Amino acid sequence: MDSAGQDINLNSPNKGLLSDSMTDVPVDTGVAARTPAVEGLTEAEEEELRAELTKVEEEIVTLRQVLAAKERHCGELKRRLGLSTLGELKQNLSRSWHDVQVSSAYVKTSEKLGEWNEKVTQSDLYKKTQETLSQAGQKTSAALSTVGSAISRKLGDMRNSATFKSFEDRVGTIKSKVVGDRENGSDNLPSSAGSGDKPLSDPAPF
């Protein structure tokens, strides 16, 4: 093997091959440094894409600045209209809840829950439980009514008993006596005052 005719350029596609009639072609370092993403593009196409990328990035920066200015203007308008942050939050929550309600997932879940509820209410176990609770409620109401009637009847019997009447008579007698003593005491007040004005008799001599 002739070492003079061997291609020693590591970047050459003819590396390791003998060539008597061809000379080494210089390799473009820019092409060698290209990433696989831009392979197959000409230099003009790459420059055009890079220019377009720069333009889009500048437009994004401009749009962000415009958006920030619009947000400040929107906040100023809300402040002048008296729209508080709490009201805006409530409005956003209401809108979000409405969006949830009209969403397909919520509708499907509601339909599924409705089907389960219908199955449960139509099941024999649910009906038996409902009947048992209804009977228990009726029995409780009847028992309370019976107890109330018994208490009322017992109180009536106590009022009609001789002991209760004797107690009422005693209370009435005591009340009449107290009232009479008060009236008699008020009548004796002037006489007591008059006796106070009467001169005392002389003591008997020894």
Swiss-Prot record:
Q: Does the keyword RNA-binding apply?
A: no
Tell me which residues bear N-acetylmethionine. Answer: M1
Give the Phosphothreonine positions (modified residues): T163, T173
Segments forming a coiled coil: 38-82
Per UniProt, the ranges with Polar residues bias are 1-14
Example GO molecular function: protein homodimerization activity
Biological process (GO) annotations held by this record are: carbohydrate metabolic process; regulation of cell population proliferation
Please give the residue ranges the record annotates as the region Disordered. Answer: 1-24, 175-206
- According to the UniProt record, list the residues that bear Phosphoserine: S3, S12, S19, S21, S96, S149, S161, S166, S192, S195
Where do Basic and acidic residues bias regions lie?
175-185
Q: Which UniProt keywords apply?
A: Acetylation, Coiled coil, Phosphoprotein
- Which cellular component, as a GO term, is one annotated location? perinuclear region of cytoplasm
Entry's InterPro entries?
A: 6hp_glycosidase-like_sf (IPR012341), TPD52 (IPR007327)
Sorted alphabetically, which Pfam families does this protein's record hold? TPD52
For this chain, the family text in UniProt reads: Belongs to the TPD52 family.
UniProt subunit comment = Forms a homodimer or heterodimer with other members of the family. Interacts with MAL2.
Q: What is the official name of this protein in its record? A: Tumor protein D54
> Which organism does this record belong to?
Homo sapiens (Human)
